[in-house]
């Protein structure tokens, strides 16, 4: 079935439109995520557990959209027959699955990271140590590679279907019932964990902000800035988690309402072709592209670099150097801040800036 769908189908004008949509969306996502992955370690604010997890997430997203922008989209647009062979397409499809798993598992860990820092702020640094973060990163990569190779062992390989504009499993020899339930239950677990964790996190942050509004007059400038950063970051994590939930729901459930035939002739006439593509392949690509866009929107440090690309690293981090007044204020309110700060352990760098560091928002 796959050989008919891949190699014996001529590319039409409508196929090239889909290829352009895939390319431009993937390229934007690649630019944003690559910028984040390379630049994040230069920010002292993100030299911590969260920064390392965010870097892994951005790297996975960048490689994922890179494959779509510079392999699948050109193959579809230019109808490159030599690159449509299963031996080549299956390897790139396998790489996409690995990067997708890395991204989604990293999102789960980051959501749990936010949850712990929100409900157990005093224990956060003892839990998310440098060693434990390294263990989590290695585990995410290992599990992602393991699931991909499990599919290969079960003779379940994926290739790009030109008529359907999506990745298809080669069946036979792949037993689709096994793949469906593996993907179905994994998707169900991920959706549940995303929804529950992010709901608790967002509700807790909302309650915290309402409580703080009654005591705003007693907050120092440092505490107000820090709370603003904490609020924006919870909004970022909630937004990214919500997008992944929507993508999983559309891919595994809503798209079933728009079935498409397998035969190329009937598929070309099907009115469900575009809805199925937008709910599956494009939603899959879009969520990885928007990951980087959302991170840039909610983090002023990254936007400052985009506005001033020639500005030195010292100039960008100058606001993090504590003044005499900020050190005096911090020492005076240190005990109160330890009690009231919910996510400070995430946003305050463990570098030599210390507790007096000024959060640049």
From Swiss-Prot:
InterPro entries in UniProt: 7TM_GPCR_serpentine_rcpt_Srx, GPCR_Rhodpsn_7TM
Identify the domain of life: Eukaryota
Keywords (alphabetical) are: Cell membrane, G-protein coupled receptor, Glycoprotein, Membrane, Receptor, Transducer, Transmembrane, Transmembrane helix
Glycan attachment positions? 317
One Pfam family name is 7TM_GPCR_Srx
Name which cysteines form disulfide bonds.
none
* Gene3D superfamilies, per database record: Rhodopsin 7-helix transmembrane proteins (1.20.1070.10)
Claim: DNA-binding is one of the keywords in the record: no
Q: Which CDD domains match?
A: 7tm_classA_rhodopsin-like
**Where is the protein found, in the record's own terms?**
Cell membrane
Q: Name one GO cellular component term.
A: plasma membrane
What stretches pass through the bilayer?
20-40, 58-78, 92-112, 133-153, 176-196, 242-262, 278-298
Instruction: Give the primary localization class.
Output: membrane
Q: Its membrane topology, per UniProt?
A: Multi-pass membrane protein
| Keyword Transmembrane helix recorded | yes
Instruction: List the GO molecular function terms.
Output: G protein-coupled receptor activity
What the record says about family reads: Belongs to the G-protein coupled receptor 1 family.
The molecule here is called Serpentine receptor class X 45
> To which species is this protein native?
Caenorhabditis elegans
Q: What is the lineage of its organism?
A: Eukaryota, Metazoa, Ecdysozoa, Nematoda, Chromadorea
């Amino acid at each position: 079935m796959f050989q008919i769908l891949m190699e014996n189908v001529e590319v039409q004008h409508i196929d090239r439109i889909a290829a352009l949509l895939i390319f431009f969306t993937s390229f934007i996502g690649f630019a944003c995520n690559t910028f984040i992955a390379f630049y994040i370690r230069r920010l002292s604010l993100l030299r911590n557990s969260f920064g390392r997890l965010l870097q892994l997430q951005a790297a996975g997203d960048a490689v994922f959209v890179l494959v779509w922008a510079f392999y699948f989209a050109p193959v579809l647009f230019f109808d490159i027959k030599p690159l449509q062979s299963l031996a080549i397409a299956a390897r790139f499809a396998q790489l996409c699955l690995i990067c997708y798993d890395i991204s989604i598992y990293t999102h789960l860990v980051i959501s749990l990271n936010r949850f712990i820092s929100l409900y157990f702020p005093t224990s956060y640094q003892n839990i998310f140590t440098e060693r434990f973060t390294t263990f989590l990163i290695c585990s995410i990569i290992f599990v992602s590679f393991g699931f991909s190779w499990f599919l290969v062992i079960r003779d379940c390989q994926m290739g790009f279907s030109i008529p359907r504009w999506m990745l298809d499993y080669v069946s036979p020899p792949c037993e689709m019932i096994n793949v469906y339930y593996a993907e179905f239950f994994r998707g169900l677990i991920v959706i549940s964990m995303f929804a529950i964790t992010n709901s608790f996190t967002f509700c807790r942050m909302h309650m915290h902000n309402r409580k703080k509004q009654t005591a705003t007059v007693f907050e120092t400038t440092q505490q107000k800035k820090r709370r603003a950063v904490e609020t924006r970051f919870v909004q970022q994590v909630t937004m990214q988690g919500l997008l992944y939930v929507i993508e999983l729901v559309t891919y595994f459930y809503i798209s079933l309402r728009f079935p498409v035939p397998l035969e190329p002739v009937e598929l070309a006439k099907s009115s469900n072709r575009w809805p199925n593509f937008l709910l599956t392949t494009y939603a899959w690509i879009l969520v990885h592209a928007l990951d980087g866009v959302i991170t840039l929107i909610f983090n002023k440090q990254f936007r400052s670099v985009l506005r001033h690309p020639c500005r030195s690293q010292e100039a960008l981090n100058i606001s993090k150097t504590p003044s005499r007044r900020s050190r005096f204020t911090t020492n005076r309110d240190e005990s109160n801040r330890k009690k009231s700060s919910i996510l400070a352990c995430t946003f305050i760098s463990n570098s030599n800036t210390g507790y007096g560091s000024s959060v640049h928002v």
